[in-house]
């Protein structure tokens, strides 16, 4: 019974963590979200873009006595840039997403077992006498439950990151519409620039998550060792610590991605 519980906990955790890679590259809802954005958000974004352009015209008119033809040309060019940006924003975001997906696909996790296998622990438990097995029941249940919860939390974070990407795709026309605001002062509008960095950070987040999983897959085998003094209880605690450390790294990966891109 204890052997089945431990095996199930390890297998479930390893499978969940491996499945996170599939979740992070899932774009099945992309087209639906884009279509919804075009019908709901795009008209609002066009209105905002026009208001921003009119505001820029008024600000320019206040600074000069007459609006020269050069200023008119700049306004028309700016209007064209905003219009093209609104039209091409899904393709820009898709290109950023595809780059991250390509990187994630290169980090194959199908054969990655962050906790390794439970054979050594099971062999140790099978060698225990019945009283010792009965005493070990509660610790085994608690630690196995903790391992599974840690795996589910990692999968939850992966789905959360996917929803974050899709929400950004849905609202994308709104921050792009502010591109014209302040453009006469040079550079990209702060709202637009912030949005692009946040979206890129969300894409990078998935890649960093997979890097964390790969790193732990490489080093976890040296962490959990049934031969270390303390017996099966210490070994199970080591396994739980590995799962929780992995969870902590995955949680922290979001802030790492944002700090890299200053988002």
Segments predicted by a language model, with ranges:
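Binding/recognition "hotspot" determinant
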Residues: 1-49
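Hydrophobic transmembrane alpha-helix segments characteristic of membrane transport
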Residues: 48-80, 171-187
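Alpha-helical membrane-interface segments at transmembrane helix boundaries
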Residues: 33-42, 77, 93, 126-129, ...
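Alpha-helical transmembrane segments
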Residues: 177-197, 229, 259-261
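Alpha-helical transmembrane segments and their helix-start/interface "positive-inside/aromatic belt" motifs
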Residues: 65-89, 192-202, 257
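Hydrophobic alpha-helical transmembrane segments
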Residues: 42-54, 142-149
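Short, well-ordered alpha-helical packing segments
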Residues: 45, 58, 73, 77, ...
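Non-cytosolic segments of integral membrane proteins
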Residues: 81-173, 202, 206-262
């Amino acid at each position: 019974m204890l052997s089945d519980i431990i095996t199930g906990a390890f297998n479930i955790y390893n499978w969940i963590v491996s499945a996170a890679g599939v979740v992070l590259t899932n774009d099945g809802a992309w087209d639906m979200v884009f279509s919804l954005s075009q019908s709901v958000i795009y008209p609002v974004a066009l209105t905002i873009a026009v208001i921003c352009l009119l505001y820029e015209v008024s600000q320019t008119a206040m600074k000069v006595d007459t609006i020269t033809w050069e200023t008119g040309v700049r306004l028309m060019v700016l209007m064209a840039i905003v219009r093209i940006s609104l039209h091409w924003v899904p393709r820009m975001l898709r290109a950023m997403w595809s780059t991250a997906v390509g990187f994630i696909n290169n980090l194959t996790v199908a054969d990655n077992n962050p906790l390794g296998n439970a054979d050594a622990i099971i062999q140790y438990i099978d060698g225990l006498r019945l009283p010792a097995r009965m005493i070990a029941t509660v610790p085994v249940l608690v630690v196995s439950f903790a391992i599974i919860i840690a795996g589910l939390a990692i999968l939850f974070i992966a789905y959360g990151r996917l929803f974050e990407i899709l929400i950004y795709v849905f609202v994308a026309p709104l921050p792009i519409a502010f591109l014209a605001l302040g453009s006469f002062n040079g550079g990209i509008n702060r709202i637009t620039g912030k949005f692009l960095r946040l979206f890129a950070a969300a894409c990078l987040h998935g890649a960093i998550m997979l890097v964390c999983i790969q790193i732990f897959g490489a080093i976890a085998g040296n962490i959990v060792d049934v031969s270390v003094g303390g017996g099966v209880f210490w070994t199970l605690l080591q396994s739980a610590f590995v799962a929780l450390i992995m969870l902590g790294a995955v949680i922290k990966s979001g802030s790492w991605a944002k700090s890299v891109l200053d988002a």
